[in-house]
Design a protein with these regions (language model features):
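Beta-propeller domains with acidic blade repeats across secreted/periplasmic ectodomains
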Residues: 1-128
Length: 128
């Protein structure tokens, strides 16, 4: 279907109502924009906290200017970035969401690590 014929995006709560799950399973909205942006990786620790890698600057890294994009969306930039920690600060982050009142919604968020540039994965250790 052409993009101009696509239906408008649903609000988060409306989108959850459209899901169909099997048997006695359930689904609920834990967190939505603007509290979260472009989640790429989600993990839960032993305390039930949700750790989220937010890929907020995809597809272009901070500090670089796109100069050419081909038919396959491969991008050439004005320069090669310096490797961390010398390169530009990014906008990606790892955040920790927690439901402290037991209602199924994340009511606290803490940025664990920020200023990442094109972060693409994370792994949790013991106790987060």
């Amino acid at each position: 279907m052409p993009l101009e014929e696509a239906p408008p995006a649903l609000a988060p709560a409306a989108a959850v109502r459209e899901f169909r799950v099997a048997g006695d399973l359930g689904i609920g909205l834990v967190v939505a924009e603007p509290q979260i942006s472009q989640p790429l990786s989600i993990s839960f620790d032993d305390r039930g906290r949700m750790w989220v890698l937010q890929y907020r600057q995809f597809p272009n890294p901070n500090g670089l200017k796109p100069v050419q994009v081909d038919n396959w969306l491969r991008t050439k930039y004005d320069r090669l970035p310096d490797p961390p920690p010398k390169g530009p600060k990014g906008n990606d982050r790892i955040s920790i969401y927690e439901d402290t009142d037991g209602n199924g919604r994340a009511d606290t968020v803490k940025d664990f690590l920020s200023d990442l540039n094109l972060a693409s994965g994370m792994a949790l250790g013991y106790d987060g």
